[in-house]
């Protein structure tokens, strides 16, 4: 295993990269490759001051630590997630955290869980000292039953770290009366190492498979519940979306109705105003054209009607002419009589006797006789 399978660099986004892997113990699920770590890659949540745990592949671990002898008391190196100091074993890391960071309650990621095969690489805890005491106790404090647990936590070459941990050559497995496995220390020898490598690797693989299966079983329950929750959320979101769509449709229909009603009212108002304007304009045109070409609209008359109309017009014109002439003649005669009377007055003023015409004299006589006959007789004396 020369690659970090299933891991990608969060800076350059390279997946299944080779070489060293640096995992941040403060940021959740943040990994860097060697080049990005050495170049000082940072983000808004990750800085260069964050403690990083180095994880090696199997090839790099054999290259760096091949041929070295380590006992069970000297596992691989870990980094303190609080102060960033490196080179701790499980025992020394627990002692360091208990003595130096007992009162610290910051949420950090366990470096041991991140390095174990099948462990949770993003296990966050706010009581790191209690987590180390419960989950990562030293091998000398373990009994036979916990020895099996320690074998399950044995180093896997594909996820090793920069420091040494219990080597496979130092682990001897013998069958006990109860059928369990027990570990004992022995002196280092290449022949023993080569002989025990396949068995240790097989056991480590079996432990990793068991742990992964247990993790899958443990995660199957919450995954099913999470799926149910997601389905419920999707149903609720769909219901909300349908309600929102219905509200939008009703609002659109209402706006359309109001628009159509307003359009109809405006149309009726415009038609009424246009009709009123047309009637007013027609009346104005009729008033203006009362004496202009009115006869064009008259119906056509027959020949007899036309002759009768012309004769009536001729009679009217003659009557008007005679009336005008008579008025003019009367004015002239009256003016001439006045002139004659004035002359007679002037003649009488000169002492001359007025000569009465004959007819006038006769009329005066007749009037006098008639008056005498009509007078009543005088009363008797």
Swiss-Prot record:
Signal peptide: none
Residue numbers spanned by region Disordered: 154-193, 294-314
Coiled-coil regions, chain positions: 225-257
Alphabetized SUPFAM superfamilies for the sequence: RING/U-box
Induction: Up-regulated by FGF2 in gastric cancer cells.
PANTHER family: E3 UBIQUITIN-PROTEIN LIGASE KCMF1
Name this protein carries in UniProt: E3 ubiquitin-protein ligase KCMF1
Species in which this protein is naturally found: Homo sapiens
């Amino acid at each position: 295993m020369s690659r970090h399978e299933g891991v990608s660099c969060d800076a350059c986004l390279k997946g299944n990269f080779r070489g060293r892997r640096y995992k941040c113990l403060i940021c959740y699920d943040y990994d860097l490759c060697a080049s990005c770590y050495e170049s000082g890659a940072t983000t808004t949540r990750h800085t260069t001051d964050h403690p990083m745990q180095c994880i090696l592949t199997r090839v790099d671990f054999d290259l760096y630590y091949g041929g070295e002898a380590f006992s069970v008391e000297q596992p691989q190196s870990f980094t303190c997630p609080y102060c960033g100091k490196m080179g701790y074993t499980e025992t020394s890391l627990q002692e360091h955290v208990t003595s130096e960071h007992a009162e610290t309650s910051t949420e950090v990621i366990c470096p041991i869980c991140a390095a174990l095969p099948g462990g949770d690489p993003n296990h966050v805890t706010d009581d790191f000292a209690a987590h180390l005491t419960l989950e990562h106790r030293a091998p000398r404090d373990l009994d036979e039953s916990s020895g099996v647990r320690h074998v399950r936590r044995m180093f896997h070459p594909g996820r090793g770290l920069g420091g040494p941990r219990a080597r496979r050559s130092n682990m001897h497995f013998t069958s006990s009366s109860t059928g369990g496995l027990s570990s004992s220390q022995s002196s280092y020898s290449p022949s023993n190492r080569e002989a025990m490598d396949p068995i240790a690797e097989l056991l480590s693989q079996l432990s990793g498979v068991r742990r992964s299966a247990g993790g899958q079983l443990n995660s199957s329950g919450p995954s099913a519940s999470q799926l149910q929750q997601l389905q419920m959320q999707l149903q609720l979101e769909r219901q909300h979306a349908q309600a929102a769509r219905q509200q939008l449709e009703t609002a659109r229909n209402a706006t359309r109705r109001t628009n159509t009603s307003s359009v109809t009212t405006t149309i009726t108002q415009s038609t009424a105003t246009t009709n009123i304007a047309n009637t007013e304009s027609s009346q104005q045109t009729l008033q203006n054209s009362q004496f202009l070409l009115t006869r064009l609209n008259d119906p056509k008359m027959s020949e007899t009607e036309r002759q009768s109309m012309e004769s009536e017009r001729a009679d009217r014109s003659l009557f008007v002419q005679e009336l005008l002439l008579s008025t003019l003649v009367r004015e002239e005669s009256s003016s001439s009589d006045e002139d004659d009377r004035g002359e007679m007055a002037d003649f009488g003023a000169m002492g001359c006797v007025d000569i009465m015409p004959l007819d006038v004299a006769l009329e005066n006589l007749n009037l006098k006789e008639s008056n005498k006959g009509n007078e009543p007789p005088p009363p008797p004396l």
